[in-house]
């Protein structure tokens, strides 16, 4: 049906992206949730307070997922490679769920339902919402939408386009492990080191591609491409993450808001440098961030297909 591997991959990536747009994440039996439960079970066996144990834990899980992806990609059948690529891409994406949650938090904050917004925030990020009021919840949600524009939208598409099913599933495994154990808490400071470093590597190029797309797409929401570039160049390196800082700074500059500052997690309070030099974000800015995130995903889909065609024989 399809003439070559590159056509198969391009069609599969586009179908996977459309499945995410139309259906979002499945409510039950999501592959990422199943992987997370398996990882938690394995951690009961592999956990030791050291980097080597953490590297073994990550290697076993990411290796298993990569081998599964390679096997799925090589199953016989004329339509199977497209179906495998589409399914893997869909499973790795989370743009629709991200946008839905961002809009829901916006709605709750506009109704001054701070308690409900606090309950919903953990589905976006690992912040401790207990002490956050409306402004803090708005900033936390906007920063999470920005960071996850890369993690849950752009980067999976680029891995799927460049290297197929094993790569996109492996990437999602790495990113999930980072969200589970890549913390600087007493338990995970050493055990989670490998997951955090591997996630930094896996997102490095994609985060910068995301920032470029933010610059290009900023005018769609009345944003400033020049402001995005300025904040990216000036502020990104101040962020503790080499990748999240790039994307969050670009969003801050594009939307003319100021992000960063005191950031409380369950295990620690971080005093982060500010990103951007605009106003404190309002609920309307969170809504703009959600729209910008969706437009960036559409741009990433186009970029992914271009990448596949560029790599064809």
Curated annotation (Swiss-Prot):
Parts of the chain that traverse the membrane: 52-72, 79-99, 154-174, 204-224, 289-309
Source organism per UniProt: Mycobacterium tuberculosis (strain CDC 1551 / Oshkosh)
Job description of the protein: Converts cobyric acid to cobinamide by the addition of aminopropanol on the F carboxylic group.
Entry keyword set: Cell membrane, Cobalamin biosynthesis, Membrane, Transmembrane, Transmembrane helix
HAMAP family: CobD_CbiB
Membrane in keyword set: yes
Biological process, per Gene Ontology: cobalamin biosynthetic process
GO cellular component, one term: plasma membrane
The family this protein is said to belong to: Belongs to the CobD/CbiB family.
Database matches in InterPro entries: Cobalamin_biosynth_CobD/CbiB
GO molecular function term, any single one: ABC-type vitamin B12 transporter activity
Ion transport as UniProt keyword: no
Protein's cellular compartments: Cell membrane
This protein's pathway: Cofactor biosynthesis; adenosylcobalamin biosynthesis
Superkingdom per UniProt: Bacteria
Topology of the protein relative to the lipid bilayer: Multi-pass membrane protein
Name the UniProt record assigns to this protein: Cobalamin biosynthesis protein CobD
């Amino acid at each position: 049906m399809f003439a070559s591997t590159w056509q198969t991959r391009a069609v599969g990536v586009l179908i996977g992206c459309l499945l995410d747009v139309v259906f979002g994440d499945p409510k039950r039996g999501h592959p990422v949730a199943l992987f997370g439960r398996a990882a938690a079970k394995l951690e009961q066996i592999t956990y030791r307070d050291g980097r080597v144990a953490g590297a073994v834990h990550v290697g076993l899980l990411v290796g298993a997922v990569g081998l599964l992806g390679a096997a799925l990609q090589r199953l016989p059948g004329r339509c199977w490679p497209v179906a495998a690529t589409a399914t893997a891409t869909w499973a790795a994406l989370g743009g629709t769920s991200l946008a839905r949650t961002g809009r829901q938090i916006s709605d709750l904050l506009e109704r001054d339902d701070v308690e409900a917004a606090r309950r919903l925030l953990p589905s976006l990020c690992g912040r401790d919402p207990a002490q956050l009021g409306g402004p803090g919840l708005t900033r936390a949600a906007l920063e999470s939408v920005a960071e996850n524009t890369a993690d849950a939208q752009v980067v999976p598409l680029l891995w799927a386009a460049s290297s197929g099913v094993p790569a996109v599933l492996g990437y999602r495994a790495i990113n999930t492990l980072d969200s589970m154990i890549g913390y600087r808490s007493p338990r995970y400071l050493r055990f989670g080191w490998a997951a955090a470093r591997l996630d930094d590597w896996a997102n490095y190029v994609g985060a910068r591609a995301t920032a470029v797309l933010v610059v290009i797409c900023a005018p769609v929401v009345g944003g400033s491409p020049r402001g995005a570039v300025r904040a990216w160049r000036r502020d990104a390196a101040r962020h503790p993450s080499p990748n999240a800082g790039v994307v969050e700074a670009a969003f801050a500059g594009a939307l003319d808001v100021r992000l960063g500052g005191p950031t409380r997690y369950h295990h620690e309070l971080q005093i982060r440098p500010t990103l951007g030099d605009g106003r404190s974000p309002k609920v309307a800015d969170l809504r703009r961030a959600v729209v910008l995130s969706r437009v960036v995903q559409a741009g990433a889909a186009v970029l992914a297909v271009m990448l596949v065609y560029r790599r064809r024989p």
